[in-house]
Swiss-Prot record:
The keyword Nucleus applies. Signal peptide: none annotated. Residues 51-69 have a biased composition (Basic and acidic residues). The keyword Secreted does not apply. This is Basic leucine zipper transcriptional factor ATF-like 3. The lineage of its organism: Eukaryota, Metazoa, Chordata, Craniata, Vertebrata. It comes from Mus musculus. It is found in: Nucleus. AP-1 family transcription factor that controls the differentiation of CD8(+) thymic conventional dendritic cells in the immune system. Acts via the formation of a heterodimer with JUN family proteins that recognizes and binds DNA sequence 5'-TGA[CG]TCA-3' and regulates expression of target genes. Required for development of CD8-alpha(+) classical dendritic cells (cDCs) and related CD103(+) dendritic cells that cross-present antigens to CD8 T-cells and produce interleukin-12 (IL12) in response to pathogens. Disruption phenotype: Selective loss of CD8-alpha(+) classical dendritic cells (cDCs) and CD103(+) dendritic cells, without abnormalities in other hematopoietic cell types or architecture. Dendritic cells are defective in cross-presentation, and mice lack virus-specific CD8(+) T-cell responses to West Nile virus. Mice also show reduced priming of CD8 T-cells after pulmonary Sendai virus infection, with increased pulmonary inflammation. Mice are extremely susceptible to T.gondii infection, with decreased production of interleukin-12 (IL12) and interferon-gamma. Residues 56-84 are annotated as: Leucine-zipper.
């Protein structure tokens, strides 16, 4: 039975830098600083992304409310138009100006008086 290389040397090689050369404490410090800097940058990026999503959500809610207000206004205006159309229709039935045979395109001093019965 032959034994392979000891487990410690395999572990040591996986920790070592490329090329299987041991790292100096200076390299280890650089690696730790780089990882910390990367961790902080990733945290900052996630926070920024969350803030952006929150802002978009607030904007969406605001636009939904504005849309709802505008839809209610449209509904009210449609109802007002319907009502005024009915009023106009009723008025047209008895308006003496519409019944008058004179052409109102011509300028007159008092076109209403000329159509009214005397």
């Amino acid at each position: 039975m032959s034994q392979g290389p000891p487990a410690v040397s395999v572990l040591q090689r996986s920790v070592d830098a490329p090329g299987n050369q041991p790292q100096s404490p200076k390299d280890d410090d650089r690696k730790v600083r780089r990882r910390e800097k990367n961790r902080v940058a990733a945290q900052r990026s996630r926070k920024k992304q969350t803030q952006k999503a929150d802002k978009l959500h607030e904007e969406h809610e605001s636009l939904e409310q504005e849309n709802s207000v505008l839809r209610r206004e449209i509904s009210k205006l449609k109802e007002e138009l319907r009502h005024l159309s009915e009023v106009l229709k009723e008025h047209e039935k008895m308006c003496p100006l519409l019944l008058c045979p004179m052409n109102f395109v011509q300028l007159r001093s008092d076109p209403v008086a000329s159509c009214l019965p005397r």
